[in-house]
Regions:
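Nucleotide donor/acceptor-binding cores
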Residues: 2
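C-terminal substrate-binding/catalytic lobe of Rossmann-fold NAD(P)-dependent oxidoreductases
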Residues: 5-7, 12-67, 146-235
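A conserved short beta-strand
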Residues: 31, 96-97
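An anion/phosphate-binding loop that grips the pyrophosphate of nucleotide cofactors and donors
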Residues: 70
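N-terminal Rossmann-like NAD(P) cofactor-binding module of classical short-chain dehydrogenase/reductase
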Residues: 73-74
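Rossmann-fold NAD(P)-binding glycine/threonine-rich loop
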Residues: 80-92, 99-122, 128-140
């Protein structure tokens, strides 16, 4: 049994991971970890993740108190908490799966470096189809990126905290790399005012409304035609 800690158990992904782990014959939940000051700290993991029953697994606000009991940490929390989790995972030499978004390029490098010393998976989006889409974006950019205008439109529910989304940023980084530039030098988030579109830029548009599931569309606009590559979640 792989002893597992879930960081950010109250979020959508945290609840889902808890359910999957509880149903799994290979995973054993040993603790949940939430941000300091949350009213659910001290409660049972099964209750706060809406499983409707106790699991006999505590939710704490200090990972260092429970980390020695685990084999792997699964983190879908916040940028600030994610960096704390990373440092503790390195210190205690624990495997880490991180799907938290919002990190800048320097912070992402910290995860890459950690992968040299501990088992590490960092992904802004763990969907198989999103990763297929990323491959398609690389192919499209190599073929037509320099002769088209590129725009990224992403849509999420009203509770999404970061914009553009981590997945959208990752897509932009792949495109920028294929074009031989940096996303930080080419990204334009939204548009306002007057003036023509600057060549070589990558536009971003973030929509937040209701309970809308994750949606990402990348448009390559030419003259007389355009290509759209999209991924839409249904839940």
């Amino acid at each position: 049994m792989i002893k597992t800690i879930v960081v950010g158990p109250r979020g959508k992904m945290g609840r889902l991971i808890t359910k999957i782990a509880d149903d799994s014959e290979d995973l054993e939940l040993v603790a949940g970890v939430g941000p300091r000051g949350r009213d659910y700290i001290g409660q049972d993991l099964g209750q706060i993740t809406m499983l409707g029953r106790d699991l006999g697994v505590p939710v704490v606000d200090d990972l260092s108190k429970v980390i020695e009991a685990c084999d792997v940490i699964i983190d879908f929390s916040t940028k600030e908490m994610g960096l704390e989790v990373l440092e503790l995972a390195k210190e205690y030499e624990k495997a880490l799966v991180c799907g938290t978004t919002g990190f800048n390029s320097v912070e992402k490098d910290l995860f890459r470096q950690a992968g040299e010393t501990i088992p590490m998976l960092y992904a802004a989006n763990t969907s198989k189809l999103v990763n297929v889409m990323n491959k398609l974006l690389q192919l499209a950019t190599a073929a037509i990126g320099e002769e088209t205008d590129i725009e990224i439109v992403e849509m999420h529910d009203r509770w999404k905290k970061d914009a553009p989304s981590g997945t959208a940023k990752e897509m932009g980084e792949l495109i920028a790399h294929e074009l031989g530039t940096e996303l930080s030098d080419t990204a334009v988030c939204g548009r306002e005012g007057t003036g023509e579109r600057k060549p070589g830029t990558i536009g971003y548009h973030s929509i937040r409304m209701g309970d809308t599931p994750s949606s990402h569309t990348v448009l390559f606009g030419g003259f007389g035609e355009r290509l759209e590559i999209s991924h839409h979640s249904t839940d």
